[in-house]
Amino acid sequence: MTRPIAIRPVGAVELVAVRFHPDGARDWLGAPLSTATDGRLDIVDRLRGVRPPAGDPEAQAKAMTDRLEALRLQQGWTVDPVVRAEVEAMMDDAPAAVRSSADQRALQRRFLDRVGVSPRMLRSVLRFRRVFDHALEPTPEAGGWLEAGLGAGYFDQPQMARDFRRFLGFTATEWAREQVELARAIASQTYKPGPPHLA
């Protein structure tokens, strides 16, 4: 995902998402991942037969990973070794390799197929996620947003602010305020008695 997407459940929801490696969902989807980027997919057919147990998040996650592993083995899913190597280098925050224009365009095409976004966009997404890794560090020197941004690889605050707006739709301050409101809303619902149970 490269922009915010609202998820509004129409009923009870427990397992909300499965997170693949950036280049790992192509074979499961059965189509170029660029067709799914920032969109909504009907995955009912792909999940037919999966019955995760209600009220048990660990068992739900296991049921889903077991299903995915069975499909991987049955259908012979593969990864593109060139794309995987580039993704791993990005995840390690290694500098981008120098390529000819033709090689760069070929890599972009492979990325659109296997990852759904360009290498440059994936680098931006990973850098943005690192802001939160740095911001949530439980060390006294972790500092605030500015230090988290610098630690994640941003050169200045406006650059990070642009990514906050692009990926979350908020400034860092607005997002932090929303998280406080969300925590309060969850806490206020947590301690309310539910409706009476009918026998």
Residue ranges of each PLM-predicted region?
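Alpha-helical bundle regulatory/interaction domains
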Residues: M1-Q104, R114-P119, D133-F155, T171-A199
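DNA major-groove recognition helix of helix-turn-helix
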Residues: F111, R123, F164-R165, A176
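Ser/Thr-glycine-rich phosphate-binding loops at phosphate-binding pockets of nucleotides
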Residues: A161, L168
